[in-house]
């Protein structure tokens, strides 16, 4: 006897879904600002490839020894930019003080590191290169100032709220950086802090008082500087008359001015710099702008300046349309930091101010600086999305 088998219906195939990363749908970031950042990164890498080739070949036997790690840092930095642009920037309310505490610990730790060119600015990480704590300190100062101002904006005219906490933070950070010594970084952080305090509503009388005190402090420092800070005194003397010591402290400035003068209107052409062949001691770092002027001329120099001006202008525009005060202050802090650092670097290269050792954002060799910079630009893009 045959038993009929129960016929089961053929199951329908389950629909196949494409794998997607669990990311939120966010408003679009500001495209003009992103394009400016990417243009500066690309321009900087091209100029670093040219400016560093000779010194890299001489020092390390590899013409791309400075470019290769910078490409890696740029890639990591762009990933950081993308991630930061997708993070709700309000999280930095909670991270501001812990990051400042971390930066202070690192600024103390760096004082126990070996000297390089008369300074102690880098923490050596075996197998991972170096870390510059001042870059983290700049980031932390912007976060802390933006956080404090945004929650106390209606009391910023009072000394105990609008001056004292900021003066304490700047005083501690500046003192630690001066011990390295890192004069340019100190000036930069003081400048960033002053701008944020002014934008945040600190009373004008306190700025006048600070200005008078600053002039008095500088006057006193000029008198006692040779005994107190020989490093700064040497830089000041070489600025006033670099040709007094053409083979010593004035050598870098003189060779930089030669490079700028050689460029003329249109430059010698990309890759054709003569001064990068061991005449300018640090063509891949603080003095890369002189190589830009030599190879690309006045036109190329104006293009670099124009990009930084546009970045600042776009940042101010984004700050004006930010969803809240905290976001606006973050954008102002980070874009002013880039612009002010670029101005200080170009002023040093052209001998307008003493050589204080400050890099050109997006152009100079340096992994910590580039990655932190791109992370900061990511925060600006996060604010530009307009989410409250």
Where are each of the predicted segments found?
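Membrane-helix boundary/helix-loop-helix interface segments in multi-pass membrane proteins
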Residues: 2-40, 46-181, 346-361, 365, ...
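Loop-to-helix entry and N-terminal half of a specific, functionally important transmembrane alpha helix
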Residues: 319-357, 363
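Interfacial segments of multi-pass membrane proteins
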Residues: 149, 187-206, 274-300, 359-374
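Hydrophobic alpha-helical transmembrane segments
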Residues: 72-80, 295-315
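Alpha-helical transmembrane segments of multi-pass membrane proteins, especially transporters
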Residues: 135, 143, 161-166, 189, ...
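Hydrophobic alpha-helical segments of polytopic membrane proteins
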Residues: 97-98, 104, 160-178, 183-224
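Transmembrane alpha-helix boundary/anchor motif
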Residues: 79, 87, 144, 219, ...
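Hydrophobic, glycine- and aromatic-enriched re-entrant/interface helices and adjoining loop segments
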Residues: 116-122, 127-130, 209-303, 322-330
């Amino acid at each position: 006897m045959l038993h009929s088998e129960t016929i089961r219906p053929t199951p329908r195939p389950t629909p196949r879904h494409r794998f997607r990363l669990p990311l939120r749908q966010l408003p679009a970031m500001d495209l003009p600002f992103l394009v400016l950042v990417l243009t500066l990164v690309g321009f900087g890498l091209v100029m670093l490839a040219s400016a560093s080739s000779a010194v890299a070949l001489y020092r390390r036997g590899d013409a791309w020894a400075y470019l290769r790690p910078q490409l890696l840092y740029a890639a990591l930095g762009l990933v950081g930019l993308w991630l930061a642009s997708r993070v709700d920037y309000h999280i930095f309310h909670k991270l501001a003080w812990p990051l400042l505490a971390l930066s202070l610990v690192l600024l103390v730790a760096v004082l126990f590191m070996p000297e390089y060119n008369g300074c102690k600015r880098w923490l050596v990480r075996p197998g991972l290169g170096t870390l510059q704590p001042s870059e983290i300190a700049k980031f932390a100062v912007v976060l802390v100032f933006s956080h404090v101002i945004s929650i106390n904006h209606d009391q910023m005219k009072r000394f105990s709220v609008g001056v004292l906490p900021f003066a304490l933070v700047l005083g501690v950070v500046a003192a630690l950086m001066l011990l390295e010594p890192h004069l340019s970084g100190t000036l930069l952080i003081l400048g960033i802090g002053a701008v944020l305090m002014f934008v945040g509503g600190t009373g004008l009388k306190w700025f006048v008082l600070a200005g008078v005190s600053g002039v008095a402090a500088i006057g006193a420092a000029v008198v006692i500087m040779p005994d107190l800070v020989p490093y700064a005194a040497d830089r000041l003397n070489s600025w006033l008359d670099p040709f007094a010591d053409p083979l010593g402290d004035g050598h870098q400035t003189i060779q930089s001015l030669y490079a700028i003068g050689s460029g003329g209107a249109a430059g010698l052409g990309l890759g054709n710099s003569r001064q990068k062949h061991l005449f300018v001691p640090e063509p891949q770092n603080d003095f890369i702008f002189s190589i830009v002027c030599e190879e690309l001329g006045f036109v190329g120099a104006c293009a670099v300046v124009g990009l930084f001006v546009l970045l600042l202008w776009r940042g101010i525009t984004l700050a004006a349309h930010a969803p809240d005060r905290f976001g606006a202050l973050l954008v102002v802090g980070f874009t002013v930091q880039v612009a002010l650092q670029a101005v200080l670097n170009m002023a040093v290269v052209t001998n307008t101010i003493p050589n204080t050792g400050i890099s050109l954002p997006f152009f100079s060799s340096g992994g910590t600086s580039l990655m932190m910079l791109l992370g900061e630009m990511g925060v600006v893009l996060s604010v530009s999305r307009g989410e409250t």
